[in-house]
């Protein structure tokens, strides 16, 4: 299920503002990601192969998990109109088929003169952090609002 769109502008942001997305990782998600990217490493696609690895079973692509951060940034915090500038990623643990990943994005710093927000990003499975990092995004001001984004996202939630 896709997250509902929410449009936030730079003026709406404050340090500590947080958004959370939860996603159960399915085999079809992993296969689809492999097809789209061409990363057909058998650790993601073959249970037989993966059983002989230290993980013991198939795991999701690390960048698939990281892509869930992009889902939050593009749809909820800050949402449509935000432009990704950079992202750091630390892969801490594997994500397995059937795991429920909780993605947490939190505003860590606002840089008003450039309309940028630094965001702390964490992906967890249960109590275990599987991925963390930091994103830098450029956020539009209200006066730059795109009427289409407003209609799609319904404005500020």
Curated annotation (Swiss-Prot):
Which residue ranges does the record assign to the MaoC-like domain?
22-120
The biological processes this protein is annotated with in GO are: fatty acid biosynthetic process; glyoxylate metabolic process
Which of UniProt's keywords are assigned here? Lyase
Provide the phenotype resulting from gene inactivation: Cells lacking this gene lose the ability to grow on C1 (methanol and methylamine) and C2 (ethanol and ethylamine) compounds.
Reaction(s) catalysed (UniProt annotation): (3R)-3-hydroxybutanoyl-CoA = (2E)-butenoyl-CoA + H2O
Q: What is its EC number?
A: 4.2.1.55
Q: Name one GO cellular component term.
A: fatty acid synthase complex
- Source species, domain of life: Bacteria
Q: What does this protein do?
A: Involved in the regeneration of glyoxylate from a molecule of acetyl-CoA.
Q: What is this protein called?
A: 3-hydroxybutyryl-CoA dehydratase
The source organism is Methylorubrum extorquens (strain ATCC 14718 / DSM 1338 / JCM 2805 / NCIMB 9133 / AM1) (Methylobacterium extorquens)
């Amino acid at each position: 299920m896709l997250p509902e769109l929410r449009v936030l502008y730079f003026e709406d942001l404050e340090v500590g503002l947080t958004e959370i997305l939860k996603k159960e990782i399915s085999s079809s998600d992993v296969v689809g990601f492999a097809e789209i990217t061409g990363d057909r490493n058998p650790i993601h696609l073959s249970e037989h192969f993966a059983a002989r690895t230290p993980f013991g079973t198939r795991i999701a692509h690390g960048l698939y998990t990281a892509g869930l951060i992009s889902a939050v940034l593009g749809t909820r915090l800050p949402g449509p109109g935000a432009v990704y500038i950079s992202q750091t990623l630390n892969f801490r643990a594997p994500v397995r088929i059937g795991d429920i990943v909780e993605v947490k994005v939190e505003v860590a710093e606002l840089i008003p003169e450039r309309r940028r927000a630094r965001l702390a990003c964490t992906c967890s499975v249960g109590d275990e952090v599987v991925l963390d990092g930091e994103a830098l995004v450029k956020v539009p001001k209200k006066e730059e609002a795109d009427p289409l984004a407003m209609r799609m996202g319904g404005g500020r939630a």
